[in-house]
Amino acid sequence: MSLMDPLANALNHVSNCEGVGKNVAYLKPASKLIGRVLKVMQDQGYIGNFEYIEDGKAGVYKVDLIGQINKCGAVKPRYAVKYQEFEKFEKRYLPAKGFGLLIVSTPKGLMTHDEARTAGVGGRLISYVY
């Protein structure tokens, strides 16, 4: 059986593990996109450390959870958004203004919607976390 969206599966697994109070989540299969999303989440203080573990197949990410995530998930379809339009999607995916973040894939790499707005670049919405 193949996964249709490994990123959505990984974020759903993180959200479920946070919900039941686990301290560690193991995400597989691992990919560069999942690693970059985890890095943004770590930089913003939603997760602790994470590490890549080679298992001879697709690899595994071990993520230390710190109890900061209420909900996280992938945005589907991946909307193309101009930096002036982030507020519309904040209202759709986040519970309140200034609470949580949208992760955006831009030509300058993955970043939060606030960083993209400050840099003046748009991109595709990848996920949300709050």
From Swiss-Prot:
Pfam families: Ribosomal_S8. GO terms for biological process: translation. The keyword Ribosomal protein applies. InterPro entries: Ribosomal_uS8 (IPR000630), Ribosomal_uS8_CS (IPR047863), Ribosomal_uS8_sf (IPR035987). Belongs to the universal ribosomal protein uS8 family. One of its GO terms (cellular component) is ribosome. The keyword Ribosomal protein applies. It comes from the Archaea. One of its GO terms (molecular function) is rRNA binding. This is Small ribosomal subunit protein uS8. Keywords: Ribonucleoprotein, Ribosomal protein, RNA-binding, rRNA-binding. Part of the 30S ribosomal subunit. One of the primary rRNA binding proteins, it binds directly to 16S rRNA central domain where it helps coordinate assembly of the platform of the 30S subunit.
